Amino acid sequence: MKFYDAHIYYDDLRTDFNQLENLNKKYQCEFIISPQCTIQSEPEKSNLMYFLQPYLLSNKFLYYIAMVISKTFYKQNKLKFFWKIFTGFKNYHKITIPNNNDVLNIIEKYHFIKSWLWINPTEEDSLKEFESLYNHPKIVGIKLHNYWHNLGENEINIILENNKKNKPVYVILKYQNIKKILDLLRKFNNTKFIIGYGGFPHYGRIWDEINKLKNVYIDVASKHLNKKLINNIFKKFAKNKIIFSSDYPYNFQDKKKFSYQLFLKRINTNHLSNKERNDFFINNIKNIIHG
């Protein structure tokens, strides 16, 4: 099946470019990659944690408990000992400065892979890197991971103000004031935003408002979303606003390799027309990155 995956990760231990190349040769699949997020592969939570998470975050009271717990995962960008229990006691170290240059060099020979320019504006010289790579032919847009890098609105604002060509922005939210998020999306209304992970950790609390904004889209990436949440996204959002993304190569493993077949089992597209299905898998993201 042909698709255009709008968010995959480079991981030096897991990303299998032969697998991606075979998908392109067989189905003409395309991908937008993001730099590595940890030294060693990203820690994968237990299935129990993934199962409970949507229920916790959908409850207003439990949401605040989850917010407090989330602040205990890392110390000085290293996963704390207690949380290693859930990741096989591996020593994960969060990358604070995404290595865009390395990824761009790696994907240079792959015509079917583009890249997000992942910027952490809390780091010194981030704006210089932004300016030096902004016009790179492989860069389709900007990525901001509010949760991973604990970004404030002012820091995000600086990057968005320097986005002179209004390139699309892939943004993953954090536990933050919803009104402030919406204010930013409205302020930069000439920029197209893709809200990653179905709006995690806010989910339905933010859906009604972002669905009203013509410049804002939502994707279905990662195991932070279950079947019910994905079904609700298809019920809530206009079909041209839903983006196919996977978070490859994490989770959904078959013989220690990411399986798109397993990932796709969560997504019911039977209710879609042929056009809507093609738009979801291919055209919606193409329309965003190609104007």
Which residues fall in each region the model found?
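Mid-domain alpha/beta scaffold segments of enzyme catalytic cores
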Residues: 1-154, 261
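Conserved, mostly hydrophobic/aromatic
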Residues: 7, 24, 103, 133, ...
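Short, well-ordered coil/turn elements that cap or connect secondary structure elements
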Residues: 26-27, 108-110, 136, 188-190, ...
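Short active-site segment of divalent metal-dependent hydrolases/proteases
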Residues: 10-11, 200, 250
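Catalytic pocket-lining loop regions of alpha/beta-barrel enzymes
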Residues: 140-141, 148-149, 153-244
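Glycine- and small hydrophobic-enriched segments that form the cores of compact globular domains
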Residues: 114-118, 168-169, 268, 272-273
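Mid-to-C-terminal alpha-helical segments outside catalytic/metal-binding sites
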Residues: 1-4, 15-31, 38, 239-241, ...
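Short secondary-structure boundary segments
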Residues: 36, 222, 246-248
